[in-house]
Regions:
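Pyridoxal 5′-phosphate
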Residues: 1-413
């Protein structure tokens, strides 16, 4: 990978933050956008502009081709068996909510159990909690090991006949551990259990093959993989998508309806895509897939892990950094900073780093159950991506050298 060449594709990297060159290390929250993705979005607004699936004129047909071409591109990106298994959404959160609401209402019964775990992002667990309040389903938790990982052994320990759904992230957004999804899927399907995967943090970094994983549903967002905001996709095995009824209704999802309330829905996936879709986002997402595949996600992942290991080596030498996920093979490093025997408030550390032009995440990272496991109210998270460099890691380490309570708090006064 030629990082210097890659960085030239990202115009935002020329800007400053706090009058310092931008060091963007918050890629777990969202990623920066390369020029080819920006161009794809601008091209839609400049030269296409029409709606999809609604016009009988040339420009509309061109939009149809681009929109449905993006569906085929997404099918290839995930190695789905059928293009009809790809439903466009506003992102991971919508996709996971759709699955939780449809499955709970249409397939589950009172007393059925959904297995989750305490490291989950809110978008992975809250939909099941809320949908279950009406249906009488309940959530149980896969115990995490001492590092905060899901293991097959711990998963087996909590399996009962009442478990009907397992809903987990393939990669934790806080700790970066990769769950043994393929092994869990095999066990699930031996027992007739649905497996729902939050792919928000795995899709940007790992080669995803949903047929090999054998999950039933898989959701991801474009904005975490160099694509536009407000768009993503839900993969669902065709047998489930064909069986499930949508929860939203409107234009394009129906074939016909009449005054007697008779309704005929369109086939999968259109029955799940009511209303005008984020067309420019879908086209931009396909451009992001082209961009990442041209570089190779195996190269991207290796680069991220190298940056993390470089950070860990430097952090150990400092002696004031507490790392919570040292052994996770990802580009996520979650840490706190000590000043003597006192842990500095994570948000204060992040605000202090901002004065150096460094962007990291702080707090609970939308995983509100995990602080109890980690025994800390919050953490800082640096998340590396394809355009980050060792020089940027050096800048982060140099700033953390002088991160004391006094220095972190003094920026507010």
């Amino acid at each position: 990978m030629d990082i210097s060449k890659i960085r030239k594709d990202f115009p935002i990297l020329t800007r400053k933050m706090s009058d310092k060159p931008l060091v963007y290390l918050d890629n777990g929250a969202t990623t920066l956008k390369p020029q080819p993705v920006i161009d794809a979005v601008v091209n839609y607004y400049t030269y296409l502009g029409a709606n999809a699936h609604r016009g009988d004129y040339e420009m509309s047909a061109q939009v149809d081709a681009a929109f449905e071409g993006a569906r085929v591109r997404t099918q290839k990106f995930l190695n789905a068996k059928h293009k009809e298994e790809i439903v466009f959404t506003s992102g991971s959160s919508e996709g996971l909510n759709l699955v939780a609401m449809m499955v709970t209402e249409q397939l589950l019964h009172e007393g059925d159990v959904i297995l989750s775990d305490e490291s989950e992002h809110a978008s992975s667990i809250l939909p099941w909690m809320q949908a279950g309040k009406k249906k009488g389903t309940k959530i149980d938790y896969i115990p995490l090991d001492e590092e905060g990982k899901i293991t097959v052994e711990n998963f087996k320990r909590v399996l009962t006949d009442q478990v009907k759904v397992v809903a987990i992230a393939m990669v934790s957004n806080v700790l970066g551990f990769v769950a043994p999804v393929k092994e869990i899927a095999k066990i699930c399907h031996e027992r007739g259990i649905l497996l729902v995967i939050d792919g928000a943090q795995s899709t940007p970094h790992l080669n995803i093959d949903v047929q090999d994983l054998d999950c039933d549903f898989y959701a991801f967002s474009a904005h975490k993989m160099c694509g536009p905001t407000g768009v993503g996709a839900l993969y669902g095995k065709k047998k489930w998508l064909d069986q499930l009824e949508p929860i939203f209704y409107g234009g394009e999802s129906n074939a016909r309806f009449d005054k007697s309330c008779s309704l005929t829905l369109k086939e999968t996936p259109l029955k799940f895509e009511s209303g005008t879709q984020p067309i420019e986002g879908v086209i931009g997402m396909a451009a992001a897939m082209d961009y990442l595949d041209a570089i190779g996600k195996e190269n991207i992942h290796a680069h991220e892990v190298e940056l993390k290991e470089y950070f860990l080596k430097k952090a150990k030498a400092l002696g004031n950094i507490v790392v919570y996920n040292e052994n996770a093979k990802s580009g996520i490093v979650t840490f706190n900073v000590k000043d003597k025997d006192q842990m500095i408030f994570a948000q204060d550390v992040a605000s202090y780093l901002n004065t150096f032009g460094i962007a990291v995440r702080s707090g609970q990272h939308c995983a509100k159950l995990l602080p109890e496991v980690l025994k800390t109210p919050g953490t800082c998270r640096a998340s590396f991506y394809l355009y980050n460099t060792k020089e940027e890691v050096d800048q982060l380490i140099d700033a953390l050298k002088n991160a004391t309570v006094e220095n972190c708090v003094s920026i507010f006064f």
